[in-house]
Structures are given as C-alpha cells and as structure tokens.
C-alpha cells in the first residue's frame, strides 16, 4: 500500500525533472547574454560545451562570441563568430567589449556593442528558440523545430564528431594561437568535389599552389567526422577516402576535435575526459593523426614563402607532431611573436661597390647542416668546384646562399628572399649561407688574400725604388703603363662588341671557334637541323668532359645575327628546371655558335610521334613541365619573355624525361611595365595564334595558344594536322578534340591507350584546359599561372566554349 502512495510523488518528480531538462535544452525568445557576470554563456545539457562570450587570450577587455569545451581547463575554442571585412569575401573575428549584449528576440539572434550598434547576426529570421547541443553544435530553430542556422554549417578552424562539411565550405587556420584572424592556410571542400589544402597569403587571401589534395574532382561529396572518430571524404558512388585513420578504444572516454592549425597541418586531437582514460593519457590535447605527415616537405610554391616565412626554414618533430620555423645563422625573426613574417640578416647588407678582395675579407660562406631552400636560384655554374662556388657567391652582392652538388660539380646561387626553406636529413647537397666574417675566423681565401697583400707591398716598394733611381727607367715605366692602359681599353671594347649584354651576373662562357670545332670532332655528329642552323653533338675537352649540343648558325644574315643575339640575351639570363641551359657561345669573326646542355632523349617531336606511344604518366610529366617553363618566362623573369615559337621540336627531354623549352631565337623581351608588343609574324604553321594575322598587339597569350595545341598532341600522341587519317573529321586535331569533348566521348581521343583510359578524368581535364588555351580571342585564354592550376586540379575548370572554326595557323 505504501508503494502506491509513493507513486504520485514519483510521477511529480519525473515531471519536474523533465521540465528542468527542457529548460536547459531550449533557449527561449527573450534570453540574453553579456560578457561579464554569471549570465555570459549557454551550456549544453551535459555541460561539455558552452556558447557565449569568451575572453580573448591576453586581453581581458575583449571578448569573442564562441563555442568552447566547457569542462577543460583552457576552455578550448572550437567555433567563433566572424563577419565580412568591408564587404569583401574575407572575414574577421567578431570581438566586442564589456557592455555588449547578445539577445534572442523578435525571431532573431543579434549581437550589439555597448553603443547599440549591431555587429553580428546569423542572417536568419523567424527563430523560435535555440539549443546548445552536447555535440558542440549551436542551433537556431524555427517554431516547427526546423534548423534555421547552426554553427556546424559555418565552421571556423575546427570540426567535431558528427560534423559534416558540404561542398563550398572551408576551414581557415588562425593567424596565431591567440589571434583569431584568418591565417595562412585553408582546407576547402571545393564545389568541384576536390578536397584541397592551400597556403593563403596574408592579408590579401590569395591562394597559392595547393600542398595537398584528395584528387577527387567531380567525385567528392562531403567531409565527415563520424561518431567513431574517423574523418573521411565521401565519394558520390558511396565509397570513402580516409583523411585521418586515428583509432581510440573508447569514444566516450575522450573529447575529440580536428583543427587546421596555424602551421597548416590538419590535426586530429583527443583529450581524456574521465578517470578511466586519464591514467593512460596526459591531461592535455594529444594529436593522434596529422595531414600532411610532413608539412615542410609538402609545401613548395613558386610564389609565396612556403611553410614558414621568407629567409627562414621549417623543421618538424615527428615524435611530437609539431612544426617549428627557425632562422639560419646570423639571422633573426622580423617579429618574434609573428614568426610567419620571416627572418632578416642581423648584419648590414653587402655593398655592391666592394671589390673582390674586400668582399672576401668581410664575408664568408658558412655551411648549414641538412637545410635547403630549393627555389630562389638565379645563377647556375657547371662544371665547378666548391671553392669557386663559395667565391662566386661571396663577391656577388645579390647572392645570399650558394648550393654545391659534388656529384654533378654544379653550383647554384640564390638571392633574397629565400623561400620554401626546410630541414631535411636527406639533403644531398652542400648549402652555404653568406655571413659576416669575424675577425678571428679562418677563411678559405685567407692565404690567397695575404699573398696578394704581400705581393702588393713588395710591388709598391720596388716601384718606388725604380722611380727614384733613374729618369730613363721612369720614362720606360710610364710608357709601359700607358701601353698597358691602351691595351686594356681596347680589350674591353672588343669584349663589349663580341659579347651581348647580360645584366643577371656573369655571362655564359665565351668559347673560341677552335674549342668548339675540337669539342664536336669537326662538327661531325648531327643532332638536328633548323631554319637558322645545324645542331651538333660534342664533348667539352676539360677534366669533366660533359656532353654538349652546339648550334652552328649557317648563314650570317641580319636576321640570323638578330636571332643569335636574342637567344643569348634571353636564355643567357634565365635559369629554370624547364628551360634548356645555355652554357656559352662563340661570336668570333663571322662564326656564330651557341652551346647548350645536351639532352639525351632528344625532342618532344621524336618522343611523341614515334611508332610506340609514350606512357601516359610521362606525357603528363612533360605537359606540366612545359607549362611551368612558360609560367616562368611570362611571370617570374625580370623581364617578361614571349617565346613566339612553341612547338614539339623546341621542347627537349633530359635523362629523366624532364621537359626543357629551347630555341629562343624568335623570342620577345618585354619591359616590366609593358604587356604587349608589335612584331611581324613568327612561329610555325599549325601552332601560331590567330592574332599573328591581325593588326593587334602580341601578348604572352600567343604562347598559351601554342601550348594548347601541344597539350592536345600530348594527350592524343598525334600531330595537330594529319592528312592520311581514315576519318576526315579527325584530320585537324583541334576540331576533333572539341567535337569529342562536346559529345562526351573523350575516350575516342585516347582509344587503345589503356593507361590514359584508366585516367580518363585527367584526360578530360587536360582536353578542357587545351580548349581554353585555343580560344580565338586572346583575352579568353587563361594565363599560364591559371593553366598550371587547372592542370594540377587546384581550381575548377568551367566548360570551355567552342574555339573559333577559323584555325589561323593553317591559313
């Protein structure tokens, strides 16, 4: 009987508990928060998370509107409100002062500053109530219970279990751990289905080349952090690509988060939350998986500083999953609190007016163990020894670092700013950085300098004695000095007449005709012939005996002389892995010869149009190499260079089938402030752009057009024009490729090529890029920067319109 009396009391107690839980779960209209006081946050039912005002680290008077882990000592922030910056696409964190109010009223959530001005709202109306869920998701719901807005749909730098990122969303790293502004990295779920990680320029927001991608263009769907701790990218066919593979025994024993950290690494973290897990795990956030595994090696951008700031280098501690940026010897951070700004020398820059001896007395080259800056090259020498490599950098006021490779006897000089610096145990080359010489430091040049000083002292003493001994001797000495001065001036004039100007530093080597005649064995072995001359194989007659290719200009007419000078002035002052290297030249009497590095695999023309098709992977490698070479010519040289004669015959392949652009005889150099030029028709039938036949200025887009033709030839392993094909519609490749693309039959272009068929998505991407390059209107063609991004899959490719039916190169 007693238990029957107790039943109504139990029912009343349960009803009260239900009402109490409902009050905690639903945040009703009229509720508000202020930064200070007890009413500064709304707590989830389990108290694991809170939404509200969070004091900015190191600034007690400034507050974020945020979501954070409520039971952890440091109250780790996982979401923070942001607003657009001056109407631009980029955003800034919302930070307010004491006296601000966040209020849920009139069907909306609004944050106002102490003056009553609205500083943030989630842009939704008809809100009935809000909820702070135990998942860490803060939701605004309508009176019907439908979600109007949620923090999970507007992520900051972190995702949590059960959170899904759909197409078009992104994570932005913070600038610093305590600075919530958009940082230097993004993880984007692109609308084209590709999941991509980008370095991000600060403060412009410009995206550099990606350092990681899922390579799921047109296939990706969403990024998922599921309840079991797995993070994966779903594919439209239902399959999954694992992004992290961390496994924890019990999800209930840990808090979880995955954050795009300030160093660009996407880390999955766990934190023990109960007594069962704490004996085994430290009471702190522990990274259990990372992407990419080595950010220092993953980032290498042609534009931008790399993983760390300019003139610094990146190092990684694999055991702790941490990344650091360091300055080299005699350098210091520009801002110790913002190391991403890079390093600067702590010594005065070298005066370019110093003579060689003074420079060697003031500066030295210090070796750096296991550190490299792979880019920033502006000069290369081969063959050469390490002592000479050091000397050439010391006496050059532009040189900051010299790299010497003993195996190939090659020296590279690098100038400021140094980019993409990284520490790597596998650096095979000797890296030397220029530093000021201390007064007691030994020098590789010290003995030579001392001897020079000693010789100079005795020369002055001897000269003084001679001048004091006899008028006749004085007369003879003066005569000899005058004659020597005359010879020196005459010699300099001859050099100026015989040697084209080269403002990039030391010019290519000047060979005598007899040296090249001997090197080629009397010009016996022909490698190829062109309009301006014949190319012969040779071997330098020195201790290294490297193979060379010697181009002999056969007819010394005015146009041939002009092409010779252009070749030396363009390729002689450039260096890039995808440009053929000019080792030297001969300008003796009527003889004009150019000396290049030897390319063992010949021209792309021979490689591509042989009886057996080259592997698809090699063709992709060549296409990317040619694109990067043109990008360097168009956008990264001191002066823009338009090649004007891009074709397979002018693309050479080295031992590893790396593409090298060659033959710059028709090239045009443009000053920095000039983007177009007027010139006569240049190039080769089948590859020239339509504007050559019109009375309009010529721009770098003529090379883009030619590249489009070459790209189609690389995809299809056939020439642009083939008159002997069975199907007349296939005669002109550019027409046929466009027809196949429109009909969705790209496979016809690579019929019989199993490797290409297997990579049909990439084939389709390459064809689309080619069709964009072939647009008749130059302004519609992409730049080579955009071309490289499209080829790499870093940007979405819109459907190309039909190129004009007029193929001017065939006229």
Curated annotation (Swiss-Prot):
Membrane topology of this protein: Single-pass type I membrane protein
Residue ranges annotated for the EGF-like domain, each copy included: 292-344
GO biological process, one term: defense response
Extracellular side: 24-464
Keywords in alphabetical order: ATP-binding, Disulfide bond, EGF-like domain, Glycoprotein, Kinase, Lectin, Membrane, Nucleotide-binding, Plant defense, Receptor, Serine/threonine-protein kinase, Signal, Transferase, Transmembrane, Transmembrane helix
Glycosites: 26, 39, 59, 219, 226, 237, 242, 321
Signal peptide start and end residues: 1-23
Locations listed in the record: Membrane
Major localisation: membrane
Record bears the keyword NADP: no
Entry protein name: G-type lectin S-receptor-like serine/threonine-protein kinase LECRK3
UniProt lineage: Eukaryota, Viridiplantae, Streptophyta, Embryophyta, Tracheophyta
């Amino acid at each position: 009987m007693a238990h029957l009396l107790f039943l109504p009391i139990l029912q009343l107690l349960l009803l009260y508990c239900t009402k109490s839980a409902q009050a905690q779960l639903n945040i009703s209209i009229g509720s508000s928060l202020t930064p200070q006081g007890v009413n500064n946050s709304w707590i989830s039912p389990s108290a694991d998370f809170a939404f509200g005002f969070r004091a900015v680290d190191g600034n007690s008077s400034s507050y974020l509107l945020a979501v954070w882990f409520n039971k952890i000592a440091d109250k780790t922030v996982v979401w923070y409100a942001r607003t657009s910056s001056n109407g631009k696409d980029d955003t800034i964190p919302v930070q307010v002062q004491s006296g601000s109010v966040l209020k849920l009223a009139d069907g909306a959530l609004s944050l106002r500053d102490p003056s009553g001005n609205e500083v943030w709202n989630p842009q939704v109306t008809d809100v009935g109530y809000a909820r702070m869920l135990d998942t860490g998701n803060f939701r605004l719901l309508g009176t019907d219970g439908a979600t109007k807005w949620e923090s999970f749909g507007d992520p900051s730098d972190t995702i949590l279990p059960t959170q899904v990122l759909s197409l078009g969303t992104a994570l932005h790293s913070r600038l610093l751990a305590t600075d919530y502004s958009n940082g230097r990295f993004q993880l984007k779920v692109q609308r084209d289905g590709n999941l991509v990680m980008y370095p991000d320029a600060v403060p412009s927001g410009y995206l550099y080349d990606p350092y990681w991608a899922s390579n799921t263009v047109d296939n990706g769907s969403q990024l998922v952090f599921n309840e079991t701790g797995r993070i994966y990218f779903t594919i439209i066919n239902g399959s999954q690509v694992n992004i992290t593979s961390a496994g924890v025994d019990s999800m209930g024993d840990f808090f979880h988060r995955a954050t795009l950290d300030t160093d660009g690494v996407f880390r999955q973290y766990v934190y023990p939350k109960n007594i069962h897990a704490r004996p085994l795990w430290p009471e702190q956030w522990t990274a259990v998986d990372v992407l990419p595994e080595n950010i220092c090696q993953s980032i290498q951008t042609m534009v931008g500083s790399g993983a760390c700031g300019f003139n610094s280098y990146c190092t990684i501690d694999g055991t702790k999953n941490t990344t650091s940026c360091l300055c080299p010897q005699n350098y210091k951070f520009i801002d110790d609190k913002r190391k991403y700004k890079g390093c600067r020398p702590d010594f005065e820059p070298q005066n370019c007016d110093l003579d060689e001896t003074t420079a060697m007395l003031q500066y030295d080259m210090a070796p750096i163990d296991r550190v490299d800056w792979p880019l920033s090259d502006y000069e290369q020498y081969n063959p050469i020894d390490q002592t000479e490599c050091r000397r050439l950098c010391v006496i050059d006021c532009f040189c900051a670092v010299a790299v010497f490779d003993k195996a190939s006897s090659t020296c590279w000089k690098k100038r400021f700013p140094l980019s993409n610096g990284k520490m790597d145990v596998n650096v095979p080359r000797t890296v030397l950085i220029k530093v000021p010489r201390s007064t007691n430091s030994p020098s590789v040049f010290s003995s030579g300098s001392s001897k020079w000083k000693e010789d100079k002292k005795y020369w002055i003493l001897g000269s003084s004695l001679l001048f004091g001994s006899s008028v006749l001797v004085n007369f003879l000495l003066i005569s000899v000095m005058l004659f020597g001065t005359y010879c020196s001036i005459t010699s300099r004039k001859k050099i100026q007449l015989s040697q084209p100007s080269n403002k990039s530093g030391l010019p290519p080597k000047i060979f005598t005709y007899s040296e090249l005649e001997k090197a080629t064995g009397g010009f016996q072995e022909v490698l190829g012939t062109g309009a301006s001359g014949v190319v012969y194989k040779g071997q330098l007659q020195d201790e290294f005996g490297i193979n060379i290719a010697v181009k002999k200009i056969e007819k010394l007419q005015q146009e041939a002389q002009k092409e010779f000078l252009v070749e030396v002035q363009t390729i002689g002052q450039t260096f890039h892995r995808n440009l053929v290297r000019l080792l030297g030249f001969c300008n003796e009497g009527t003889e004009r010869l150019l000396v290049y590095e030897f390319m063992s695999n010949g021209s792309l023309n021979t490689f591509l149009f042989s009886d057996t098709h080259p592997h698809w992977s090699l063709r992709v490698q060549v296409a990317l190499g040619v694109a990067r070479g043109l990008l360097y010519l168009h956008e990264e040289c001191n002066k823009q260079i338009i090649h004007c004669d891009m074709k397979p015959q002018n693309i050479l392949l080295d031992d590893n089938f790396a593409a090298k652009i060659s033959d710059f005889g028709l090239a045009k150099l443009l000053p920095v402030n000039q983007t177009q030029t007027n010139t006569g028709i240049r190039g080769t039938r089948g590859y020239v752009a339509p504007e050559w036949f019109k009375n309009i200025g010529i721009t770098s887009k003529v090379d883009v057009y030619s590249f489009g033709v070459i790209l189609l030839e690389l995809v299809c392993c056939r020439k642009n024009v083939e008159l002997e094909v069975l199907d007349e519609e296939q005669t002109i490749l550019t027409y046929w490729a466009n027809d196949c693309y429109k009909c969705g039959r790209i496979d016809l272009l690579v019929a019989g090529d199993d490797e290409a068929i297997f990579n049909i998505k990439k084939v389709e991407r390459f064809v689309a890029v080619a069709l964009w390059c072939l647009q008749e209107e130059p302004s519609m063609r992409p730049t080579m920067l955009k071309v490289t991004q499209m080829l790499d899959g870093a940007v979405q490719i819109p459907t190309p319109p039909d190129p004009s039916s007029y193929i001017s190169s065939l006229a």
